[in-house]
Amino acid sequence: MKNPIIDNIPCVLLAGGKSSRFTINNIQINKALMPLKSYSSLLEYQYTRLLKLFKQVIISAKKSYELNAPYLLEKESGLFSPLFGIHNAFLTLQTPYIFFIPIDAPLVSFESIKALCGIENFSVVYAKSPTKEHYLISLWHKSTLNALNYTLKTQNYRLSDLVKNTSSVAIHFNQEEEFLNLNTLKDYELAVQILKKRANG
């Protein structure tokens, strides 16, 4: 077993979302609990996978799940914004840098994550694929704390506004596929196919 490669930056898995577009037969499903590969849930898949790269992986969620893992609980029960999870992570973990990744981005390669974690001197280092910015697949520095405080106070939950008002940098990646977000059942089915294809060769 290789030693985890990144031991100076914790990884926070953002799992406090609403899954509002993830429906099966018009019933809203919590996508964190959808099975993936041989794992009982997307949550378990992501947590187990990221532990191969990071020494410390913590799940940010509204409530803890059955999965035995460290959790950061978001106290704002009725409000859904990843900014609460990011803000809470900095207040709790007290580390200069934290890498964030959403639970519903299971295809991001370790190479891409390492590239993002290898760049310092910016408040936010985020991934950009050919068609969009991925502000939540990103390395954040604690210098964003004041901006986060202000954003939450003024209730402007637009992530892009916050990131663009900090010293941020986009790292460009050519692969669209690895940044697939599992927003819908269709996205989930596509990810299952991609993972199958990867396993076969």
Swiss-Prot record:
Known catalytic reactions: Mo-molybdopterin + GTP + H(+) = Mo-molybdopterin guanine dinucleotide + diphosphate
Binding site for GTP: L14, A15, G16, K31, D104
GO biological process, one term: bis(molybdopterin guanine dinucleotide)molybdenum biosynthetic process
Location, primary (coarse class): cytoplasm
Localization, UniProt: Cytoplasm
Cofactor needs: Mg(2+)
One Pfam family named in its UniProt record: NTP_transf_3
One Gene Ontology term of the molecular function aspect: molybdenum cofactor guanylyltransferase activity
UniProt function note: Transfers a GMP moiety from GTP to Mo-molybdopterin (Mo-MPT) cofactor (Moco or molybdenum cofactor) to form Mo-molybdopterin guanine dinucleotide (Mo-MGD) cofactor.
Comment block on domains: The N-terminal domain determines nucleotide recognition and specific binding, while the C-terminal domain determines the specific binding to the target protein.
Family: Belongs to the MobA family.
NCBIfam families with a match to the protein in the record: PRK00560.1
The protein, known as: Molybdenum cofactor guanylyltransferase
UniProt gene name: mobA
